Amino acid sequence: MSTDFVFSRLLDKQSEPIQLTAPVAVSELPTPALVLERSILQRNIESMRDFLAAEGKGFRPHSKTHKCPVIAKLQMEAGAVGVCATKLSEAVALISSGLTEILITSPIVSKSKLEILNKVLP
């Protein structure tokens, strides 16, 4: 499988938030779907930031928890020093959404994955 094909497949998986204006039945949601109350999410991000700041610590949340570049951007806007990604595919999604401070927490050992990484790095 060529790295160009794999790379294009990774970029095809991008998503944007959809603001629901009316309730939607769970059975009608496209899956997978991350459904949350944005104000509560923002409050939780700020609480984490404030708790760690009170201890003199910064934070670098792991995107594996939410797998969502939009949430990673909110965390960065709240003061995170960066975000972590377990796999290259997670890092590619974050990079292609405009994030730059990404720590890949697993080793990249194959030549094809290194080629993909080189294509997405600025």
Pin down the residues of each PLM region.
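Active-site-proximal beta-alpha core segment in soluble small-molecule metabolic enzymes
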Residues: 62-122
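Catalytic cores of large soluble enzymes that bind and process phosphate-bearing ligands
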Residues: 33-40, 63, 109
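Generic N-terminal amphipathic, Lys/Arg-enriched alpha-helix
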Residues: 17-36
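Short linear motifs at secondary-structure transitions and domain/linker junctions
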Residues: 8-12, 59-60, 104-107
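A generic structural signal for short
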Residues: 36-37, 59-60, 79
